[in-house]
Amino acid sequence: MSSRKRAAIIAAILIGALLLSILINSIITLVQKSNHPIKYSEYVEKYASEYNVPEYMLYAVINVESSFDESLRSEDGSIGLMQMSGDTVKLLSSDIHFDKDINIDSLYDPETAISYGAYYLRYLFNKYKKWDTAIAAYYAGEGTVDSWLNDTEYSEDGESLSKIPDKKTRSYVKAVKSAADYYKNTFYRNGVSVK
């Protein structure tokens, strides 16, 4: 085989490998984007701004909690996009921002769910000062997280969790962090939306 023919074959193989690599990368990107949609952006942007919660964090919590299914009701009675419980809604409705007589079924409305969820995330972040701890409290409850923070086995400083003892909460925090990282790195540059 001549060196010219060999060079042509090598070039064809390299071009084929490059095209295959581009195709695989495109498929991976499409799958990741389909697993991390951007929905209800009008409400996410509005309440992220109003309550000073990063948009990507709201998208991540909605994605992990409900996969953007506004009609979801879990076995424990949590409702809507942000899967909030009746007890949490009662707690939040005592705040001046919200209707004191809210019906729990109002959380099937995306705007209501995102409004309450964003407010609650800000409340938890203000209390715990770290997103990991706030996200753990969103899932497991404040009382549970407070008890972990008071236990030196789980918190070295009483302010942040060095270990999350509950496997489901640990998995939840990991899933939200992973989704938040994806949203942040894919749809935001220097805090500015590029979606």
Model-derived features: where do they sit?
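N-terminal Sec-pathway targeting helices
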Residues: 1-23
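Export/targeting segments at the very N-terminus of extracytoplasmic proteins
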Residues: 20-71, 93, 186, 194
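Second-shell loop/turn segments in exported
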Residues: 30-34, 45-47, 70-79, 99-110, ...
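Substrate-binding/active-site groove segments that recognize
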Residues: 47, 76-99, 115-117, 148, ...
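Short, functionally critical alpha-helical segments immediately adjacent to catalytic or ligand/cofactor-binding
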Residues: 52-70, 114-118, 134-140, 176
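Surface-exposed patches in mature extracellular/periplasmic domains of secreted proteins
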Residues: 57-59, 72, 101, 128-137, ...
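Cell-wall polysaccharide-cleaving catalytic domain and substrate-binding groove, primarily
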Residues: 63-88, 141
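Catalytic and substrate-binding regions of cell-wall glycan-acting enzymes that process beta-1,4-linked
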Residues: 127, 136-191
